[in-house]
């Protein structure tokens, strides 16, 4: 039985844990798998699940602090809950502002990725392929293995080394960086590698008009 003040006893807590141990174990195992294997360039299915979890954490966290402020234990905890609710709300708002700015720059739904606001854009076969990056590097590597292209670890489809784009870009909510194709080397027929080096950065907007040249993939934002 619960105490008169609404708390539970140690024995009741032990029984509760015994009943829910299996479920808690599965939840922790799921979280471990998401943290260890859910990367955009490894397992796209697990990565999407992780993004959904991250999206849901924002409103759930905000709701927890709001409820803690409404049903406060005392004024001190209520004040802390209000401050944390304001902080989470501002962080959530800044995420949406950065995401919409990035979407205006790239027109890609990857702009709303809660894990990163850096997007790789590769023009290939008349289509601009966009993938998330965790950080913007000075040099980005491209590898072709048996005719399959990987850039920054992302599989982008079939491509011959002579058909590699001359330029790729990396977009953030504030800038668009140009990367120029540098050294490239064919290895064993349909395999090879290349490197793209950053040579320009500015307030540009990705040109999504696929009818234009694939080498002209960005426009200056006025």
Curated annotation (Swiss-Prot):
GO molecular function: identical protein binding; protein sequestering activity; structural constituent of virion
UniProt GO BP: symbiont-mediated suppression of host cytoplasmic pattern recognition receptor signaling pathway via inhibition of MAVS activity
Keyword terms of this UniProt record: Glycoprotein, Host Golgi apparatus, Host membrane, Host-virus interaction, Membrane, Transmembrane, Transmembrane helix, Viral envelope protein, Viral immunoevasion, Viral matrix protein, Virion
Keyword RNA-binding applies: no
Post-translational modifications reported in the UniProt record: Glycosylated at N-terminus by host.
Membrane topology of the entry: Multi-pass membrane protein
Keyword set includes Transmembrane: yes
CDD domains on file: SARS-like-CoV_M
Annotated localization: Virion membrane; Host Golgi apparatus membrane; Host membrane
Topology, Virion surface side: 2-16, 71-75
Effect noted on mutating residue 19 to E: In strain: Omicron/BA.1, Omicron/BA.2, Omicron/BA.2.12.1, Omicron/BA.2.75, Omicron/BA.4, Omicron/BA.5, Omicron/BQ.1.1, Omicron/XBB.1.5, Omicron/EG.5.1
Signal peptide (from-to): none
Intravirion compartment residues: 37-44, 106-222
Transmembrane residue ranges: 17-36, 45-70, 76-105
Positions annotated as glycosylated: 5
Superkingdom of origin organism: Viruses
Primary location class: virion
Any one cellular-component term (Gene Ontology): host cell Golgi membrane
Oligomer status and interactors: Homomultimer. Interacts with envelope E protein in the budding compartment of the host cell, which is located between endoplasmic reticulum and the Golgi complex. Forms a complex with S proteins. Interacts with nucleocapsid N protein. This interaction probably participates in RNA packaging into the virus. Interacts with the accessory proteins 3a and 7a.
Function in brief: Component of the viral envelope that plays a central role in virus morphogenesis and assembly via its interactions with other viral proteins. Regulates the localization of S protein at cis-Golgi, the place of virus budding. May act by binding cytoplasmic c-terminus of S.
Family named by the database record: Belongs to the betacoronaviruses M protein family.
Identification of the protein by name: Membrane protein
Species this protein is from: Severe acute respiratory syndrome coronavirus 2
């Amino acid at each position: 039985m619960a105490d008169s003040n609404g708390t539970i006893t140690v024995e009741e807590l032990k029984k509760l844990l015994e009943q829910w141990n299996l479920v808690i174990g599965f939840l922790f195992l799921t979280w471990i798998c998401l943290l260890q294997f859910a990367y955009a360039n490894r397992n796209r299915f697990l990565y999407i699940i992780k993004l959904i979890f991250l999206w849901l954490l924002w409103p759930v966290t905000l709701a927890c602090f709001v409820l803690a402020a409404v049903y406060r234990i005392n004024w001190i905890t209520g004040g802390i809950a209000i401050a944390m609710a304001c902080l989470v709300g501002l962080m959530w708002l800044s995420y949406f502002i950065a995401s919409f700015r990035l979407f205006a720059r790239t027109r890609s739904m990857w702009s709303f990725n809660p894990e990163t606001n850096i997007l790789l854009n590769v023009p290939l076969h008349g289509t601009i392929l966009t993938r998330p990056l965790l950080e913007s590097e000075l040099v980005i590597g491209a590898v072709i293995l048996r005719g399959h292209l990987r850039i920054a670890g992302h599989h982008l489809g079939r491509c011959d080394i002579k058909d590699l784009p001359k330029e790729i870009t990396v977009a953030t909510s504030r800038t668009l960086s140009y990367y120029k194709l540098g050294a490239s080397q064919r290895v064993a027929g349909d395999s090879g590698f290349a490197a793209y080096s950053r040579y320009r950065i500015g307030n540009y907007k990705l040109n999504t008009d696929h009818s234009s040249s694939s080498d002209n993939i960005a426009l200056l934002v006025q």
